[in-house]
Every structure is written in C-alpha cells, then in structure tokens.
C-alpha cells in the first residue's frame, strides 16, 4: 500500500510543492530511522491540500467559458427556477455573506434564495440578514420567533420557495459559480430526473479548497450505511412534497 501511495503522488512531485515533499522524503531515506515508518509519516502529513490544488488547476482547463455557458443556456429546453433553501442559525457574517454572494455569482441566473432565520441569538447574523432583506427580489428572508431546529427551519425556508426544483444549501456553504448551470444541464439531458447530488469539498480559512469528497453513482448498498448525498443536493419539488418534506 505504501508503494501505491507514493506512486499516486508522483504527479505532484513535479510541482513546486511536490519538490518540497520529495526533498523531505530523500532526507528521511538517509536518516538512521526505519525507512517505512519515516516514509509513512511524510505521506501522512498535510500535503493533501497541495495535491488537491494541483488536481483543481488541471480541471480548470475543462471549465466552460462565459460564452460557452451562454450558448448552452440559450439552447436549454428546460430552464427551471431553482429555489435554494437555507436555514440560518447564528452563522458568522463572513460565512453567511460568502454563501449569499456565491449564489448571486451563479452563471445560471434563474434561481431564488430562501433564507429562514431560526431565531438566531447572534446579533451579527440578524443584522446581516436584515441588511439584505428586500434588496434583491430573488433573495427572500424570513425570521422565526422560536428555535425550531434544522428540519423544521428548512421546511419554513421551503415555504418561501416557488421553484420546480429545490436545492439544499447550509448557511456556511459556498457554491461553485457553475453549480446551478451543471445541475440544469443535467436536467436537460434527462427531464425525468428527480434528485441530483454532487461531489463536495471544504474551504480553509484562507479560501483554499481541501478535503474533497468524491461520490459514486447511486449505490443502494452503500447508501444503507452511508448518507453520502448531503451537499449539494437538488430535488424536484413535487417529489419533496410527496415525501412529506423534512421530519
């Protein structure tokens, strides 16, 4: 396994960050300590962010340009309104604002953002939501007078929505600019689709993407033991209502 761990990281060795890793490995090879133990230690150190950044830089070449996105969108047979429902509770402004701005930056424009504050006690959270309320007709904000917890608060956010598809986004999530575009492109390939889920990753405090979670195609056996759907998920409205919403 150790051998394959090294081989899997070879592309990184030719990057700037990879050279540092290689130097670390070589210096440890000539030390008096056990080679296998030392190599394992190097490979287990936090180089994952650098490796993932290398992967993302390569994938960036595959991203469609603005003109390509416009061309695709104009050709779409289906251009559904996507309602993004987001329950909010005591979220720091820096994360909540990033979530809102990420939605506003979407390349697919037929969306609405439905924010329901679950009786936050953080004045920072309340003030920010008040500051954006009624500033954009596509952004709906409502305030609860009691804490209902996430399931019922999500239902309250859903009550603000009108779209034929709903998207689930946490108050501290940030969407890729083409997230909704990719969702609608998939819907146009299969107009009977009811549920879409995506890969996800995390952001460091400095804004670097890390800890990718690459998900399989739908796997009923895996799903029995691992709820890998989560973020980012998009559900047809009628199916969500038929299921009885969140409970």
Which stretches of residues belong to each language-model region?
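Acidic donor-binding segment of Leloir-type glycosyltransferases
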Residues: 104-146
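Acidic metal-phosphate-binding loop of nucleotide-sugar-dependent transferases
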Residues: 119, 148, 173-174, 200
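Catalytic metal- and UDP-sugar-binding loop of GT-A-like glycosyltransferases, i.e.
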Residues: 144, 169-171
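Short aromatic/hydrophobic "clamp" motif used to bind/position activated sugar donors
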Residues: 166
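Conserved nucleotide-sugar donor-binding catalytic segment
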Residues: 220-247
